[in-house]
């Protein structure tokens, strides 16, 4: 859908949405986003120009349906997919992508680390995707030298970063905020560095005794990104991997650097969002969101979870959705889903579905709590359908219609029960929603109460007004 929009920009030195917004231009992508979000085009342009909203939209991803991430737009959800050296292939990852889009993923990250042709997998995903695709280029940089940190050069990093841009990647996690002087700060942690990309950069710095090349070559990366309109997702290499490590000196030192990098990218008119934790106790979530807004000048915040407890392997889509809902309420712009397989293995298609639905619930709950216009409309419509025993309408309005119908039909599968005024929980005689109290009933009751002159309800005998 974007081919004609893109062609007239090709050859420009900077094709980013931020660049056009700062010139007062409402691009076709901004206009499209304004309709999707039910926002004025001028507001979308202003928020993009300010850096509070991003529209990840690489010019080489022509089949993309533009979307927005930012405090003025609805809270978004990202789904991670990707092949590992031990599992999956390109066709399986495309199936996961299609499933993720079906269940409402707003963006998808390809986190493939090896075992397959990474370029083939990525290209297949981008070609099949109507939503923005993100990647972590350091994975392929390391794979390109067969896992040898010693052989991995600064130019290797930049070569892979540009390759991802050329292939149409809309945003890349760039772990530029981890500095060599931050590494001693992890000494007191229970779980050290839990970011895969951060771990690669830490190993590189420890071996070469040099500063993080993604930091020292950051201006070069900006030059690459603005030619393709690729968005920075500034990686939090020192995010906490457990409750004990949350909000520690290591995390906050890196966050300060991420704020510096945000403003440096903005000087090049390159779009930025900032990644965040991780594992955070409930009482620290608001602090983390507000601290990011302060340090990073309100660039959109993109958090993984956060998990609010560490004792539930197999259920971390739940432990993290709790934290995600709170983070969204306090101003986080996008939530990265966690599946039931987190910490245990590579998620399959069913895990993708479970994780996504949990996070769509969290994001929607956050939108309601933030009083976004229209956020509760679907809830109210479903509630009216529930009160009217319109079962098919309830299924249709559900986040997961198939699951809702499946659970209903376990005990009452016949079509006749789609008109029944009960489900198997209460049965035909005890459903409280069968008791329909009308306005006329309440008006009659008000007259009786008024006539009683404020008598105690516990002892007063109320005469029915016919």
From Swiss-Prot:
GO terms for biological process: thiamine biosynthetic process; thiamine diphosphate biosynthetic process. [4Fe-4S] cluster binds at residues 423, 426, 431. Its cofactor is [4Fe-4S] cluster. Binds 1 [4Fe-4S] cluster per subunit. The cluster is coordinated with 3 cysteines and an exchangeable S-adenosyl-L-methionine. Keywords: 4Fe-4S, Iron, Iron-sulfur, Lyase, Metal-binding, S-adenosyl-L-methionine, Thiamine biosynthesis, Zinc. Zn(2+) binds at residues 279, 343. Pathway: Cofactor biosynthesis; thiamine diphosphate biosynthesis. GO terms for molecular function: 4 iron, 4 sulfur cluster binding; carbon-carbon lyase activity; zinc ion binding. Substrate binds at residues 80, 109, 139, 175, 195-197, 236-239, 275, 302. One of its GO terms (cellular component) is cytosol. Signal peptide: none annotated. Transmembrane segments: none annotated. Gene3D superfamilies: 6.10.250.620, Radical SAM ThiC family, central domain. It catalyses: 5-amino-1-(5-phospho-beta-D-ribosyl)imidazole + S-adenosyl-L-methionine = 4-amino-2-methyl-5-(phosphooxymethyl)pyrimidine + CO + 5'-deoxyadenosine + formate + L-methionine + 3 H(+). Its EC number is 4.1.99.17. InterPro entries: ThiC, ThiC/Bza_core_dom, ThiC/BzaA/B. NCBIfam families: PRK09284.1, PRK13352.1, thiC. Catalyzes the synthesis of the hydroxymethylpyrimidine phosphate (HMP-P) moiety of thiamine from aminoimidazole ribotide (AIR) in a radical S-adenosyl-L-methionine (SAM)-dependent reaction. Belongs to the ThiC family. This is Phosphomethylpyrimidine synthase. It comes from Synechococcus sp. (strain RCC307).
């Amino acid at each position: 859908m974007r081919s004609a929009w893109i062609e007239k920009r090709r050859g420009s030195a900077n094709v980013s949405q931020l660049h056009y917004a700062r010139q007062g231009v409402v691009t076709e992508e901004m206009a499209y986003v304004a309709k999707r979000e039910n926002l004025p085009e001028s507001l979308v342009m202003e928020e993009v120009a300010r850096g509070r909203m991003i529209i990840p939209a690489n010019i080489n991803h022509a089949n993309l349906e533009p979307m927005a991430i930012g405090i003025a737009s609805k809270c978004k959800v990202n789904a991670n997919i990707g092949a590992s050296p031990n599992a999956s292939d390109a066709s399986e990852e495309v199936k996961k992508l299609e499933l993720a889009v079906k269940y409402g993923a707003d963006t998808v990250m390809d986190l493939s680390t090896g075992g397959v042709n990474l370029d083939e997998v990525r290209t297949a995903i981008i070609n099949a995707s109507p939503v923005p695709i993100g990647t972590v280029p350091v994975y392929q940089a390391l794979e390109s030298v067969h896992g040898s940190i010693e052989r991995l050069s600064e130019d290797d990093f930049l070569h892979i970063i540009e390759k991802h841009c050329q292939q149409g990647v809309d945003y890349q996690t760039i772990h530029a905020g981890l500095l060599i002087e931050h590494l001693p700060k992890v000494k007191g942690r229970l779980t050290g560095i839990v970011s895969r990309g951060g771990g690669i950069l830490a190993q590189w710095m420890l071996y070469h005794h040099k500063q993080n090349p993604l930091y020292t070559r950051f201006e070069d990366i900006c030059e690459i990104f603005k030619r393709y309109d690729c968005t920075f997702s500034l990686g939090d290499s020192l995010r906490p991997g457990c409750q004990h490590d949350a909000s520690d000196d290591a995390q906050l030192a890196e966050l300060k650097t991420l704020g510096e990098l945000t403003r440096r990218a903005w000087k090049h008119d390159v779009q930025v969002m900032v990644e965040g934790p991780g594992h955070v106790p409930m009482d620290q979530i608001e602090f983390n969101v507000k601290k990011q807004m302060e340090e990073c000048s309100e660039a959109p915040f993109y958090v993984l979870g956060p998990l609010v407890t560490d004792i539930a392997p197999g259920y971390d889509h739940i432990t993290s959705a709790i934290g995600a809902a709170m983070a969204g309420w306090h101003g986080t712009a996008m939530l990265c889903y966690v599946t039931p397989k987190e910490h245990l293995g590579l998620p399959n298609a069913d895990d993708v579905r479970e994780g996504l639905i949990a996070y769509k619930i969290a994001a929607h709950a956050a939108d309601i709590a933030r009083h976004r216009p229209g956020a509760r409309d679907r809830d109210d419509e479903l509630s009216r359908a529930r009160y009217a025993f319109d079962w098919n309408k309830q299924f249709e309005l559900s986040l997961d219609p198939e699951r809702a119908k499946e659970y209903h039909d376990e005990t009452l599968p016949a079509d006749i029960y789609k008109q029944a005024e009960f489900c198997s929980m209460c049965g035909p005689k005890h459903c409280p929603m069968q008791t329909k109290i009308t306005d006329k009933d309440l008006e009659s009751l008000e007259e009786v109460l008024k006539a009683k002159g404020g008598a105690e309800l516990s002892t007063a005998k109320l005469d029915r007004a016919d």
